[in-house]
UniProtKB/Swiss-Prot annotation:
Entry protein name: Capsid protein
Location (main, coarse): virion
SUPFAM superfamilies: Positive stranded ssRNA viruses (SSF88633)
Keywords, ordered alphabetically: Acetylation, Capsid protein, Ribonucleoprotein, RNA-binding, T=3 icosahedral capsid protein, Viral nucleoprotein, Virion
Species in which this protein is naturally found: Cucumber mosaic virus (strain C7-2)
Function statement: Capsid protein. Probably binds RNA and plays a role in packaging.
The keyword Ribonucleoprotein is annotated on this UniProt entry: yes
Length: 218
């Protein structure tokens, strides 16, 4: 074998890949494929659950019933002394209340603690007599009778506890928008005084669509 043949043979040997060196996937490749599959499934889930005019997302957690949307009220409780109570009737905007016969299916309250929140509060929603002045004594009795679900919201290091929502189903009661003034959100400050800069309540009322609801709620 002359020198040129020897050089060519050496070059061919160098070009021959080692067995399995390029075919075996790395752990990074495997992780990337798993991540891609997860993202694909997530995109499909999000696409299926995106709100539409007929199916707006109810309080960012689930779809409204077909033919329903929701209106929102934001409540900021005043200072509540330790062991005392606060109550506020549900007063919807005039643009909604003029359709007072539209049915209401659910009320959901989201408790949003502000950065200074370090207390324990009990929150509920109740139908209260028109004659009630929502005094401390009256609200105390409503919390004690066990007639409505109560959400207990406590300080959490993350700022918001895992379960910060209370859902009140009115479907069986055939309640309508006009009835909402008969309902009130009630708050009990258990451990110490609740200051004005500690808590915000977001109340979402799911009701039949009304002519003014031509766009998705925010």
């Amino acid at each position: 074998m002359d020198k040129s043949e020897s050089t060519s043979a050496g070059r061919n040997r160098r070009r021959r890949p080692r067995r399995g060196s390029r075919s075996a996937p790395s752990s990074a490749d495997a992780n990337f494929r798993v991540l891609s599959q997860q993202l694909s499934r997530l995109n499909k889930t999000l696409a299926a659950g995106r709100p539409t005019i007929n199916h707006p997302t109810f309080v960012g957690s689930e779809r409204c019933k077909p033919g329903y949307t929701f209106s929102s009220i934001t409540l900021k409780p005043p200072k509540i002394d330790r062991g005392s109570y606060y109550g506020k009737r549900l007063l919807l905007p005039d643009s909604v209340t003029e359709f007072d016969k539209k049915l209401v299916s659910r009320i959901q309250i989201r408790v949003n603690p502000l950065p200074k929140f370090d207390s324990t509060v009990w929150v509920t929603v109740r139908k209260v007599p028109a004659s009630s002045d929502l005094s401390v004594a009256a609200i105390s009795a409503m919390f004690a009778d066990g007639a409505s679900p109560v959400l207990v919201n406590q300080y959490a290091a993350s700022g918001v506890q895992a379960n910060n929502k209370l859902l009140y189903d009115l479907s069986a009661m055939r309640a309508d928008i006009g009835d909402m003034r008969k309902y009130a959100v009630l708050v009990y400050s258990k451990d110490d005084a609740l200051e004005t800069d500690e808590l915000v309540l977001h109340v979402d009322i799911e009701h039949q669509r009304i002519p003014t609801s031509g766009v998705l709620p925010v």
